[in-house]
Amino acid sequence: MPELFAYTDGACSGNPGPGGWGVLLRAIEGETVLKERELCGGEAETTNNRMELLAAINALETLERPSKITVVTDSAYVKNGVTGWIFGWKRNGWKTAGKKPVKNVELWQRLDLAQARHDVTWKWVKGHAGHPENERADELARAGMKPFKPKKARA
């Protein structure tokens, strides 16, 4: 049975500013990549955290059937949120421990729903540290952002 991995990343030029998200999906058997799919998208005015969340959401939502998958992210915000903080937020009616509304609540709710139909293992990796699949996800995120970046004026 092949193993399924989603390598996810978000990018933002300014925070807020134009941003993009990228996903590298891989089905692997042993050392052999059986199937690979790349996804990306972006927004004109966003934040890095929103793009990191959208990368994970799109990775899970694109799967056609319930799957066992490892989602690899360089975002401690996403990893800590989905494996820890989210349980308290849900218990507190989507409020933080300080009784403030959770930032990006609509995306956290969407991620919660997206992961519910899968058996997800979440893994954090250090970003920009030479991890080839994470670097590819970063390239995809920057490609997703590109249409939303202002064009540089030529001198």
From Swiss-Prot:
Q: PROSITE patterns recorded for this chain?
A: RNASE_H_1 (PS50879)
The RNase H type-1 domain is annotated at: 1-146
- Which transformation does this protein catalyse, written as a reaction? Endonucleolytic cleavage to 5'-phosphomonoester
DNA-binding listed as a keyword = no
* Needed co-factor(s): Mg(2+)
- What does this protein's UniProt record list under function? Endonuclease that specifically degrades the RNA of RNA-DNA hybrids.
Family membership noted in the UniProt record: Belongs to the RNase H family.
Q: Can you name this protein? A: Ribonuclease H
Taxonomic placement: Bacteria, Pseudomonadati, Pseudomonadota, Alphaproteobacteria, Rhodobacterales
